[in-house]
């Protein structure tokens, strides 16, 4: 809980979130038009139904139902056997039919939860998950407004939480956890920059210790977790100042100005009756039987927290590494392919430290990496069988990442194979000791830290290719003579 220090008393935030998650699907919710619209030219992924041409009827995409059921199960929801679609009536240029098809009365899923481990295992209740159409997009340029209907009709899951959140830290954790789960089960890509994971935040404040809910404001269409946090903090503080100054709050719908860092009113908040909801007469109700729910449940992958706990239990990984490896489904798959051939801790270290450092620097995903799981396996093979040293492996990996070449070809091309010939290493050690007689004398007089200096000189002479264990052994032997 975050306490806001007021002039008259302490206040607490009351926050509920409505997340609009775009369903991963080839086609839209009620038409055959493509749902992959982000990079498309305006109005090129549009069917006659999407722009409400007369006589066009909706045809329900069953795959979107499956995706919503899968999401509900992953969030511990009750999947309702009966569900139906309704019309939400309002007028806006990017809504050509004058209504949005949604699920007001009978959502697909209810009564779920998300557990926030970093917030003392706090449970945030999920009120409902329902399917609905996305609207088009209004583009304002040069004093004119254009409408792109590519997005119109794309399937959204609206995931509504109870007002259980009490701080922006909890909000950020909730959104990250929810996004991770949806990505992992393959129902939403969670890309906030592309608008496929958007958030509306309902914010109110009340005196600390009160159980009465205050007048809330709804902040619409927040498309980054950072902006969600900034918007909520600004709005909560604005409400506290207003209340302490004796002002009466009005239920409003707000936008967040990311440049000014403040909220502004776009309209008075509507209630349900303002939208005149009624059942859509063009769509049958849904009967979702228990057998279908069981089949969808069987298709669920191992969820991130379950997978993380298994990594910690079976592979003895620390929580930090395990959390990183399960944060993305593709990363977990990469790790599991490598760990079939190599020690889990060795694999995790190379993926989390070396691979991720380069991926993050370039801002690319693991699927875009030139170093595939098979290449990582080969590199670790070379380390384990002592073909190359760990130090040389770092050089090999850097070249692999830049060129896409296999590790063995790089080792052969650059002559990086580890020097294991005892006689050759012995000659180099003798030369190093002969050139540092004063340090040898100091070592024998008790300055044992110089041992590392001798090792470093030998590795320098061999350009890091000498077997470190062999070097240590021979130096010890020579210093005892």
UniProtKB/Swiss-Prot annotation:
It comes from the Bacteria. GO terms for biological process: glutaminyl-tRNAGln biosynthesis via transamidation; translation. InterPro entries: Asn/Gln-tRNA_amidoTrfase_suB/E, Asn/Gln-tRNA_Trfase_suB/E_cat, Asn/Gln_amidotransferase, Asn/Gln_tRNA_amidoTrase-B-like, GatB, GatB_C_1, GatB_Yqey_C_2, Gln-tRNA_amidoTrfase_suB_CS. The keyword Protein biosynthesis applies. Heterotrimer of A, B and C subunits. SUPFAM superfamilies: GatB/YqeY motif, Glutamine synthetase/guanido kinase. Keywords: ATP-binding, Ligase, Nucleotide-binding, Protein biosynthesis. Its EC number is 6.3.5.-. Pfam families: GatB_N, GatB_Yqey. Allows the formation of correctly charged Asn-tRNA(Asn) or Gln-tRNA(Gln) through the transamidation of misacylated Asp-tRNA(Asn) or Glu-tRNA(Gln) in organisms which lack either or both of asparaginyl-tRNA or glutaminyl-tRNA synthetases. The reaction takes place in the presence of glutamine and ATP through an activated phospho-Asp-tRNA(Asn) or phospho-Glu-tRNA(Gln). It comes from Ehrlichia ruminantium (strain Welgevonden). Belongs to the GatB/GatE family. GatB subfamily. It is an enzyme of class 6 (ligase). The gene is gatB. Coiled coil: none annotated. It catalyses: L-glutamyl-tRNA(Gln) + L-glutamine + ATP + H2O = L-glutaminyl-tRNA(Gln) + L-glutamate + ADP + phosphate + H(+); L-aspartyl-tRNA(Asn) + L-glutamine + ATP + H2O = L-asparaginyl-tRNA(Asn) + L-glutamate + ADP + phosphate + 2 H(+). This is Aspartyl/glutamyl-tRNA(Asn/Gln) amidotransferase subunit B. One of its GO terms (molecular function) is ATP binding.
């Amino acid at each position: 809980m975050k306490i806001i220090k007021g002039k008259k008393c302490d206040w607490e935030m009351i926050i509920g979130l409505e997340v609009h998650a775009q369903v991963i699907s080839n086609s839209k919710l009620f038409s055959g038009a493509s749902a992959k619209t982000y990079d498309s030219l305006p109005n090129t992924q549009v069917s006659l139904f999407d722009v409400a041409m007369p006589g066009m009827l909706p045809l329900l995409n069953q795959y979107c139902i499956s995706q919503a059921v899968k999401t509900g199960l992953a969030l511990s929801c009750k999947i309702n056997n009966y569900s139906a679609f309704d019309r939400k009536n309002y007028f806006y240029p990017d809504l050509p039919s004058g209504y949005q098809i949604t699920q007001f009365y009978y959502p697909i899923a209810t009564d779920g939860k998300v557990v926030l481990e970093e917030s003392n295992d706090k449970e945030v209740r999920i009120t409902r998950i329902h399917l609905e159409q996305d609207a088009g997009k209004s583009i304002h340029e040069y004093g004119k407004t254009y409408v792109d209907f590519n997005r119109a009709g794309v399937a959204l899951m609206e995931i509504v939480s109870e007002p259980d959140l009490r701080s922006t830290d909890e909000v950020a954790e909730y959104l990250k956890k929810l996004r991770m789960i949806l990505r992992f089960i393959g129902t939403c890509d969670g890309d906030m920059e592309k608008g496929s994971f958007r958030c509306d935040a309902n914010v109110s404040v009340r005196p600390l210790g009160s159980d009465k809910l205050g007048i809330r404001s709804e902040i619409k269409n927040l498309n980054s977790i950072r902006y969600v946090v900034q918007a909520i903090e600004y709005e909560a503080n604005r409400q506290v100042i207003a209340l302490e100054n004796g002002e009466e709050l009005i239920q409003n719908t707000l936008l967040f100005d990311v440049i000014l860092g403040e909220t502004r009113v776009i309209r008075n908040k509507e209630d349900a009756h303002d939208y005149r909801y009624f059942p859509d007469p063009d769509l049958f109700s849904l009967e979702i039987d228990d057998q279908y729910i069981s089949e969808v449940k069987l298709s669920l992958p191992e969820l991130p927290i379950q997978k993380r706990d298994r990594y910690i239990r079976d592979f003895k990984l620390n929580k930090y590494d395990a959390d990183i490896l399960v944060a993305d489904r593709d990363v977990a798959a990469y790790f599991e392919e490598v760990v079939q051939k190599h020690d889990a801790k060795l694999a995790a270290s190379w993926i989390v430290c070396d691979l991720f450092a380069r991926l993050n620097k370039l801002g690319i995903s693991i699927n875009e990496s030139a170093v595939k799981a098979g290449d990582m396996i080969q590199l670790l093979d070379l380390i384990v069988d002592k073909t190359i040293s760990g130090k040389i492996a770092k050089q090999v990996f850097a070249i692999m990442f830049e060129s896409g070449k296999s590790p063995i070809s790089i080792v052969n091309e650059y002559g990086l194979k580890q020097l294991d010939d005892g006689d050759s290493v012995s000659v180099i050690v003798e030369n190093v000791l002969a050139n540092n007689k004063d340090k040898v004398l100091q070592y024998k007089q008790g300055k044992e830290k110089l041992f590392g200096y001798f090792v470093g000189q030998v590795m320098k002479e061999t350009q890091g290719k000498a077997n470190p264990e062999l070097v240590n052994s021979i130096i010890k032997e020579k210093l005892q003579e």
